[in-house]
From Swiss-Prot:
InterPro entries: Acyl_CoA_acyltransferase, Bact_Acetyltransf, GNAT_dom. Gene3D superfamilies: 3.40.630.30. Acetyl-CoA binds at I97, Y98, L99, R106, G107, L108, G109, K110, N136, E137, N138. This is Uncharacterized N-acetyltransferase in pepI 3'region. It is an enzyme of class 2 (transferase). Residues 4-173 form the N-acetyltransferase domain. Its EC number is 2.3.1.-. CDD domains: NAT_SF. Keywords: Acyltransferase, Transferase. One of its GO terms (molecular function) is acyltransferase activity, transferring groups other than amino-acyl groups. It comes from the Bacteria. It holds the Pfam family Acetyltransf_1. It comes from Lactobacillus delbrueckii subsp. lactis.
Length: 173
């Protein structure tokens, strides 16, 4: 696919970053959760203060995937103290990886994932890990095809609903 670029997100990109974050999260999980829980989650976690703070956090890195100049998806990587769990002090967490619906099933998720692996190796990380909702079969299958295996789980709260995320990892050697 021509015209594909992965570029780092900065504070000037915040309005576009908020928009794609809300769109992709709602598209991915809206049908499986109540409108009330979804609205509460989006209001609390995908806003200017929260995402602006995340962009400024040391050890957190955001990237847009652009196709012919249009933002098609994004990726959030965490290292060191920015990781959400104490999985491995030398780990790389993929905290978020999302594509707009119109860009799915075109190999772009694979490109974002491979970019994350490259960053992990560039940063001399030994383990790549992430959390995935236990009911997100498409994502679980994708991660299995990329060599990740389940090692634990944690609770993810969406609105008032306590859900289970499986934690998956793979070695970066």
């Amino acid at each position: 696919m021509t015209g594909v670029k992965i570029v780092q997100v900065s504070e000037k990109d915040l309005p576009e970053f908020i928009a794609i974050s809300r769109e992709t999260f709602a598209d991915t999980f809206g049908k499986d959760n109540s409108p009330e829980d979804m609205a509460k989650f989006l209001e609390k976690t995908i806003n200017e203060d929260k995402l602006g703070g995340e962009i400024a956090t040391p050890g957190s890195f955001f990237y847009f995937l652009k196709v012919d100049g249009e933002v098609a998806g994004y990726l959030k990587l965490d290292v060191d103290d920015a990781q959400n769990e104490e999985v491995d002090p030398n780990g790389l967490e993929i905290e978020r990886i999302y594509l707009r619906k119109s860009f799915q099933h075109r190999g772009l998720g694979k490109q974002l994932f491979e970019f994350a692996e490259e960053k992990g190796r560039e940063w001399s990380k030994s383990v790549l890990w992430l959390g995935v909702w236990e009911h997100n079969e498409n994502a679980k299958n994708f991660y299995a095809s990329r060599g990740l295996t389940r090692f634990s789980e944690h609770v993810f709260v969406l609105g008032d609903d306590r859900q289970t995320d499986f934690l998956l990892k793979k070695a970066l050697v």
